[in-house]
């Protein structure tokens, strides 16, 4: 007889979903869905369709609902605002309605990008001030979850890394792709500060909070405060290519045609609540970066 608790994970086909499946699947009975069915453990669902989303969750009768999916490309959100708010805000509201009807907790993933970057660091109690439509749509989802769902877990991530070449659409894969394509000089911004977040550490810390039943809002990033430039230097070091590739620091304006969406100068989060509860198991970003490259990029560069 299967006595495992059941978790429904919506939007599970990306870099974060891959980590959540890996971390949770041994101890829980999972149903993982996505609009892009790219794994054998995924089934098809567009969570923007409220009726189908509700029916699918109700039929599974989970103990928890984890809503992962979102549009995270800032430029896409600026130029496709209707889709950005439909996906990042209204679908989250739908998830709250579903969780409340079933009387189960909801887990929502927010972002360090909801702050305006005027401060150097932000803890769990600092007031967000989102700059662009991606940040606004994500923060609107966060506010709704916090106000409308009694048992909620909101976890704010930083610069995500995870999933490897097929699923990582973020900074690490973009740098790795340039290296794979033979670039010998990389132009990297040195005026954007933040905190990397390894998907597997993030999923493990979410699992810990669920099992401890400490609901609420938590910053959840790797330790070690850094910036894009420093992350690239460390990546080149991990790859052993310090003598092969030149890293040239540039200002954000250098990339303004490709990356025109407004971004905060600092997205550095402090895991103050996790620290106070003694539940911060997020490791140093350098340790995680080395593990990530070793586990996901063997043979990638030839």
Language model features with spans:
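Amphipathic terminal alpha-helices
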Residues: 284-302
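NAD(P)H-binding glycine-rich loop region in Rossmannoid oxidoreductase-like domains
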Residues: 47-87
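Catalytic helix-loop patch of NAD(P)-dependent Rossmann-fold dehydrogenases
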Residues: 86, 90-91, 114-155, 159-161, ...
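NAD(P)-dependent short-chain dehydrogenase/reductase
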Residues: 143-194, 200-208
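Mid/C-terminal beta-alpha module of Rossmann-like enzyme folds, strongest
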Residues: 205, 212-259, 300-301
